[in-house]
C-alpha cells in the first residue's frame, strides 16, 4: 500500500478510525476499534504507525497496511488513556491516563519503562521540545513537570484550584506553555531555565477565551513564522485563533454544530483540522478562517484527529 504524503486520521464514538485524502475529502481506509472508544490519535515521526489511545489500552496500527489488527498493544494502564505522543526519534512513547499515571513505553517491546504518579486523573501530557521533560495536567487542576533525567517531578503548580486542566501546549522553541481549563480560561507562562536546567514558569497572561469548556489548546508550529498563533477549541462549537503577540483574537472559526474536541495545525501553520461532536472533521484555511473541506463518513461524534504533512523523521 503506497503511503500518501499527507496522513490525516480521525476517530469517533462510532468505534472507527478513518484515513482521509486531505485535499479531496475522500475516506480511503476505515479501521474498526470495537473494544472501546478512542480518546487520542498520534502519528509516529516516521509516518509509519498510528497510536490510538482507548480504554485502557493503546493500540499501534501500521499506516501502510490494509490490516484491521494492531501491530502491538500497550496494556499497563487501568483506565481511559487521554494523552499519547512520541519522542522525536520515535524510540519511545509517552501516555497519560485517568488512572492517575504518566507512563513511558519502549515502542518496540511494548514494555512500560517508567511510571509517574499524578494522584489525579491525567487529562493531558506534552513533551517539552528539549525531549527531556514531560508536562502533565490533571482533573484536580495540577500541572507537573517530570524531569526524565532525574526521574522525578521537578515542578508543580495549580493555576486554578479544583478546576481541571483539559489541555496543554508548548511553543516549538520551548519558550512558552499554555494550559486550558474547564472554565474557558487559558493560562500562559514563559518558560525559563533555572541554574540546574529545571524548567521554571513565569506568569505571562491570563486569557478568558471561551464561556464553555476549552477541550484543546494548540500553539502553531515553527514554520508558521513570522506570526505565532494559539488555537482554542471549545464546547461552544467554535475554534478561536489568537495572536500570541498580545493574545488578540484574530479569527473565530464558525461552522461546527456541536462541541469541538480536537484540532491540529498543518506543518506550515496555513491550515487547521478540527474534530467535532457534529460527526464531522473540517479543514480550515488560516488566511480567511473559512472551512474549505468537510470530512463526512463517521456517524457519531468525532473526538480526535491526527495530521502529519511534513517530512518523515527517520528513527535513530
From Swiss-Prot:
What do we know about how this protein assembles, alone or with others? The target of rapamycin complex 1 (TORC1) is composed of at least RAPTOR, LST8 and TOR.
Which PROSITE patterns does this chain map to?
WD_REPEATS_1 (PS00678), WD_REPEATS_2 (PS50082), WD_REPEATS_REGION (PS50294)
Protein's UniProt name:
Target of rapamycin complex subunit LST8
Family, similarity comment: Belongs to the WD repeat LST8 family.
Cellular component, GO annotation = TORC1 complex; TORC2 complex
Intervals holding WD repeats:
1-32, 33-71, 76-115, 117-156, 160-199, 209-252, 255-296
- The organism encoding this protein is Oryza sativa subsp. japonica
Q: Which cysteines are joined by disulfide bonds?
A: none
The UniProt entry, under InterPro entries, shows: G-protein_beta_WD-40_rep, MLST8, Quinoprotein_ADH-like_sf, WD40/YVTN_repeat-like_dom_sf, WD40_repeat_CS, WD40_rpt
Which processes are annotated in GO (biological process)? regulation of actin cytoskeleton organization; TOR signaling
Q: Name one Pfam family in it.
A: WD40
Q: Which UniProt keywords apply?
A: Developmental protein, Growth regulation, Repeat, WD repeat
| Role according to the record | Component of TORC1 complex, which is an essential cell growth regulator that controls plant development. Acts by activating transcription, protein synthesis and ribosome biogenesis, and inhibiting mRNA degradation and autophagy.
Is Repeat one of the keywords UniProt gives this record?
A: yes
Which domain of life does the protein's organism represent? Eukaryota
Amino acid at each position: 500500500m503506497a503511503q500518501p504524503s499527507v496522513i490525516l486520521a480521525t476517530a469517533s464514538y462510532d468505534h472507527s478510525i478513518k484515513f482521509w485524502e486531505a485535499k479531496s475529502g475522500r475516506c480511503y481506509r476505515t479501521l474498526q476499534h470495537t473494544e472501546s472508544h478512542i480518546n487520542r490519535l498520534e502519528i509516529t515521526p516516521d509516518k509509519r504507525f498510528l497510536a490510538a489511545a482507548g480504554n485502557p489500552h493503546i493500540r499501534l496500527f501500521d499506516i501502510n497496511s490494509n490490516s484491521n489488527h494492531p501491530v502491538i498493544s500497550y496494556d499497563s494502564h487501568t483506565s481511559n488513556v487521554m494523552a499519547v505522543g512520541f519522542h522525536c526519534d520515535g524510540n519511545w512513547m509517552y501516555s497519560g491516563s485517568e488512572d492517575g499515571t504518566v507512563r513511558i513505553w519502549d515502542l518496540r517491546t511494548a514494555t512500560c519503562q517508567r511510571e509517574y504518579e499524578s494522584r489525579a486523573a491525567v487529562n493531558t501530557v506534552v513533551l517539552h521540545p528539549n525531549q527531556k521533560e514531560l508536562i502533565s495536567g490533571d482533573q484536580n487542576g495540577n500541572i507537573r513537570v517530570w524531569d526524565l533525567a532525574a526521574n522525578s517531578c521537578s515542578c508543580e503548580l495549580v493555576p486554578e484550584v479544583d478546576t481541571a486542566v483539559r489541555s496543554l501546549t508548548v511553543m516549538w522553541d520551548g519558550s512558552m506553555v499554555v494550559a486550558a481549563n474547564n472554565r474557558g480560561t487559558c493560562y500562559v507562562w514563559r518558560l525559563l531555565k533555572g541554574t540546574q536546567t529545571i524548567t521554571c514558569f513565569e506568569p505571562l497572561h491570563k486569557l478568558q477565551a471561551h464561556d464553555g469548556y476549552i477541550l484543546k489548546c494548540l500553539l502553531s508550529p515553527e514554520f508558521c513564522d513570522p506570526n505565532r498563533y494559539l488555537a482554542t477549541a471549545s464546547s461552544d462549537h467554535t475554534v478561536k485563533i489568537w495572536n500570541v503577540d498580545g493574545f488578540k483574537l484574530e479569527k473565530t472559526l464558525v461552522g461546527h454544530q456541536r462541541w469541538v474536541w480536537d484540532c491540529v495545525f498543518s506543518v506550515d501553520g496555513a491550515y487547521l483540522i478540527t474534530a467535532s461532536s457534529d460527526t464531522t472533521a473540517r479543514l480550515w484555511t488560516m488566511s480567511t478562517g473559512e472551512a474549505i473541506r468537510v470530512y463526512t463518513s463517521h456517524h457519531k461524534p468525532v473526538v480526535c484527529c491526527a495530521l502529519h504533512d511534513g517530512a518523515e523523521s527517520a528513527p535513530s
